């Protein structure tokens, strides 16, 4: 067990800083990466109007992982041409927005957590020897689940976009935004809101309620560029002034926390330091990192 290895390495009387523990845990999981083949929690892949774009689902099929493609009633016929019926979860309504879809997945899942993964992820990688190396999907998701197994205050975790991996040296970043390939805690009474940048808003809701988020810096997703494929959010949420309105909605919910900027003719939320104000750390029945040190009992 990883806990026993850490305890043996540092000794019973060794005081260990919180971030040191998280890094050591990350190193142990990466060193034993091939062992993490169990993906315990259900996987949902929301998809809209692009039944033939099989990126995420191919990666999951190749790994022989079960999943549900979450679709709207108006798309059923198209998706049935590409997927067996048992892999389709048909929502009740059409064109209700991203928040409705994500909340539908959360309500449908009966486990403690569920995966919600965008449909345009080509493959999964790890950061290894300063390179992004493609790895089995099953192991990447399994390692992500294992990392939080001993904690009970995690609201959500996510993989990082592979393009950002070069800039991060640590295994994880605590209390940052989660997005695109996220493992969501179903036990929290927190819901996505449709009038804003939903992933940012959901992460902020988690943190303001005192829970933690974890962004994996060495477990990565190779995600297609926004707009590369028709359908999805490209033709709805981001169309026209949709991007600007969602950014303004985020400002409404979190006054003073986010600034809107325009880059390459598109509106964006500028990088914010708001995340730095959340100082809570992961904890569990035998682990509490909130005093910046950990003493094994």
Q: Where does each model-flagged region fall?
A:
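Conserved catalytic core of nucleotide-sugar-dependent glycosyltransferases
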Residues: 124-208
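Short, well-formed alpha-helical segments that are part of the catalytic scaffolds
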Residues: 24-32, 43-64, 75-82
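Short, solvent-exposed loop/turn segments at secondary-structure junctions
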Residues: 50, 120-122, 162-165, 220-221
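Active-site-proximal specificity loops/subdomain of glycosyltransferases
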Residues: 72-115, 122-133
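Short loop->beta transition adjacent to catalytic acidic/histidine clusters or analogous donor-positioning motifs
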Residues: 37-42, 60-69, 85-87
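C-terminal catalytic/acceptor-binding lobe
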Residues: 13-42, 50-51, 194, 200-297
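A structural signal for short, well-ordered beta-strand segments and their strand-loop junctions
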Residues: 69, 113-118, 155-160, 213-217, ...
């Amino acid at each position: 067990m990883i806990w026993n290895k850490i305890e043996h390495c540092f000794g019973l009387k060794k005081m260990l800083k919180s971030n040191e523990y998280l890094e050591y845990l990350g190193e142990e999981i990466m060193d034993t990466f091939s062992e993490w083949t169990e993906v315990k929690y259900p996987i949902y892949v929301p998809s809209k109007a692009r039944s033939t774009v099989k990126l995420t689902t191919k990666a999951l099929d190749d790994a022989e992982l079960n999943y549900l493609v979450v679709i709207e009633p108006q798309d059923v016929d198209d998706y049935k041409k590409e997927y067996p019926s048992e892999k389709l979860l048909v929502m009740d309504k059409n064109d209700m927005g991203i928040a409705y879809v994500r909340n539908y997945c959360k309500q449908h899942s009966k486990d403690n957590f569920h995966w919600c993964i965008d449909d345009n992820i080509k493959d999964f990688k790890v950061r290894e020897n300063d390179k992004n190396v493609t790895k089995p999907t099953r192991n990447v998701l399994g390692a992500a689940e294992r990392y939080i197994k001993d904690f009970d205050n995690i609201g959500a975790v996510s993989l990082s976009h592979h393009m950002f991996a070069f800039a991060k040296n640590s295994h994880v970043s605590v209390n940052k935004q989660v997005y695109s390939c996220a493992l969501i805690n179903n036990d929290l009474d927190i819901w996505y809101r449709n009038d804003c940048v939903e992933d940012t808003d959901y992460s902020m809701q988690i943190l303001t309620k005192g829970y933690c988020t974890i962004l994996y810096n060495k477990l990565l997703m190779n995600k297609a560029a926004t707009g590369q494929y028709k359908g999805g959010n490209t033709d709805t949420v981001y169309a026209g002034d949709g991007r600007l309105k969602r950014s303004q909605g985020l400002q409404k919910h979190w006054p003073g926390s986010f600034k809107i900027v325009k880059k390459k003719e598109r509106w964006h939320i500028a990088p914010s330091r708001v995340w730095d104000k959340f100082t809570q750390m992961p904890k569990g029945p035998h682990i509490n990192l909130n005093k910046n040190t950990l003493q094994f009992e």
